[in-house]
Swiss-Prot record:
Name under which the protein is recorded: CTP synthase
Keywords assigned by UniProt, alphabetized: ATP-binding, Glutamine amidotransferase, Ligase, Magnesium, Metal-binding, Nucleotide-binding, Pyrimidine biosynthesis
UniProt-listed Pfam families: CTP_synth_N (PF06418), GATase (PF00117)
UniProt similarity note: Belongs to the CTP synthase family.
Enzyme class name: ligase
InterPro entries: Class_I_gatase-like (IPR029062), CTP_synthase (IPR004468), CTP_synthase_N (IPR017456), GATASE (IPR017926), GATase1_CTP_Synthase (IPR033828), P-loop_NTPase (IPR027417)
Subunit field text: Homotetramer.
Pathway: Pyrimidine metabolism; CTP biosynthesis via de novo pathway; CTP from UDP: step 2/2
């Protein structure tokens, strides 16, 4: 039977519960255990699909088409286990399911209440489908004290009593701020956070304390005394130089040993961490540097591109170089010449996005890369803008544009109205809802034999990648674009939807309709990112 680890947060948000959960999952995995990670999000949205990137950050898409929290990306990258739609749920989804059942009459006239109906739904979600796992790590979003989170805290409180003895452990992630004027770490915020947690019936078994310095023994003793935990269970979560150093740092601090002790499990074998040590060796001792310009719309909120940042880092790890990122707001290029901003970079990446704001700037970035032979990687929207640039400046279609921005005489990019998902036909219309209506999840693509992208994938002629888009390049313009050098080197297996474009006579210019960053791992860098960084290394010698 699976054992459950519940990770909560206190004092402030954005402490890194997702990373802590992922790192602990990796440590347990390194000891030979089979782990599953799940996220409970207290907000009322059904999913983060329609939320602003400025508020929520990246939307992480799974193979089965779920739009989920970015923490699931950490889970995948650290454990290698693909997440599914069953690994993330929101208050909105729970309420929707309950109300649907109530309208159907499933509750036989009962008064629907938070306790027991909402809490039971949360417990059912947490417990479902875990028979094949040794440990299930469940992260509760937000911080203790948030009104939205109360049903989730009540549910995990009940679960400890529902499960057999020694089958549930609570870890509370908190902050120990350092006050320079006093010259000491302050424990009072953590004490109050634990007091709040205990007031709703949850006694943490382990305190994971974020800090930028060593925790003095006296402060550990104080935290153990006033928070009612063993002194050995006060774990120091020191800041590290890169996120892939977190598993080893937490192991050295004793987190995984303390978790096993809390379950009454004798430590069998130490975790095998050599692969993590090798990753960190490459991160800390690069053999060179490259600079990549990210020309995007949400550059003020780096979390909007979380998986992208990590995938570029993985490309650097694969090539033993440090990848420096130059963030550029694409709107700038609508007013200014891109050259002064881009002449020094070794590669240009235009990521996914939505809407007209900044689109012309992205088109100009693609033009600069094409004309100056700078490696270019266009992802989703970035591919579409590269195609529009080619249509305007190579083919001579001056009015080439996307119907996403309004009516146009030359719709190079248009709304997908239907596509195949397996053997089923999916249909959409302009008047449809925004939420959950995109082409989402893993879809296959057929690659042209001998094309550059096929070579990047090791000679493969069919791949599967994750998508998140509702607009698509119009194949009616395919022949004219190919006559001017822009090759459609990847299509959906039925030949209807363009997936990949490339220039054969360019050092490295590839646009993809999918999101390869979602499948990149530190131990398995995505081939497109590894190849892109390799091309940037070559370009760096020419600057």
């Amino acid at each position: 039977m699976a054992r459950y680890i519940f990770i909560t947060g206190g004092v402030v948000s954005s402490l890194g519960k997702g990373l802590a959960s992922a790192a602990l999952g990796a440590l347990l995995q390194a000891r030979g255990y089979k782990v599953r990670l799940r996220k409970l999000d207290p907000y009322l949205n059904l999913d983060p699909g329609t939320m602003s990137p400025y508020q929520h950050g990246e939307v992480f898409v799974t193979d089965d088409g779920a739009e989920t929290d970015l923490d699931l990306g950490h889970y995948e990258r650290f454990t290698g286990r693909p997440a599914t739609k069953a690994d993330n749920i929101t208050t909105g989804r729970i309420y929707q399911d309950i109300i649907t059942k109530e309208r159907r009459g499933d509750y036989l006239g009962a008064t629907i209440q938070v306790v027991p109906h909402v809490t039971n739904a949360i417990k059912e979600f947490v417990l479902d489908g875990n028979d094949d796992y040794d440990f299930v790590l469940v992260e509760i979003g937000g911080t203790v004290g948030d009104i939205e989170g109360l049903p989730f805290f009540e549910a995990i409180r009940q679960l400890k009593n529902d499960l057999p003895r020694d089958h549930a452990v609570y870890i509370h992630l908190t902050l120990l701020p350092y006050i320079p004027s006093a010259g000491e770490l302050k424990t009072k915020p953590t004490q109050h956070s634990v007091k709040e947690l205990r007031s709703i019936g949850i006694q943490p078994d382990i305190l994971l304390c974020r800090t930028d310095r060593e925790i003095p023994k006296e402060e550990r003793r104080k935290l153990g005394l006033f928070c009612n935990v063993r002194e050995s269970a006060v774990i120091e979560a020191r800041d590290v130089d890169n996120i892939y150093a977190v598993p080893e740092a937490y192991h050295n601090a004793g987190l995984d040993d303390e978790v096993l002790a809390a379950f009454g499990i004798a430590s069998r074998i130490p975790p095998e961490l050599r692969s993590w040590q090798q990753i960190n060796e490459r991160v800390r001792n690069p053999e060179g540097n490259v600079t990549i310009a990210i020309v995007g719309k949400y550059t003020g909120m780096k979390d909007a591109y979380k998986s992208l940042i990590e995938a570029l880092s993985h490309g650097g790890i694969a090539n033993k170089v440090k990848v420096n990122l130059d963030w550029i707001e694409s709107e700038i290029f609508e007013k200014e010449d891109p050259a002064p901003f881009l002449e020094h970079v070794n590669g240009i990446l235009v990521p996914g996005g939505f809407g007209q704001r900044g689109a012309e700037g992205k088109i100009r970035a693609a033009q600069f890369a094409r004309e100056r032979d700078v490696p270019y990687f266009g992802i989703c929207f970035g591919m579409q803008m590269a195609v529009i640039e080619a249509a305007r400046n190579l083919v001579g279609i001056e009015d080439a544009n996307s119907t996403e921005f309004g009516p146009t005489k030359e719709p190079l990019v248009g709304l997908m109205t239907e596509w195949l998902r397996g053997n089923e036909l999916e249909k959409r219309s302009q008047a449809g809802d925004l939420g959950g209506t995109m082409r989402l999840g893993a879809y296959p693509a057929a690659l042209n034999r001998g094309s550059r992208v096929s070579q990047v994938y090791g000679g493969a002629t069919e791949i599967s990648e994750r998508h998140r888009h509702r607009y698509e390049v119009n194949t009616a313009y395919k022949d004219r674009l190919e006559q001017h050098g822009l090759k459609f080197s990847g299509l959906s297996p039925d030949g209807v939807l363009p997936e990949i474009v490339e220039y054969e006579d360019h050092p490295w210019f590839i646009g993809v309709q999918f999101h390869p960053e979602l499948k990149s791992r530190p131990f398995e860098p995505h081939p497109l990112f590894a190849s892109f960084i390799q091309a940037a290394m070559v370009q760096s010698r020419l600057v």
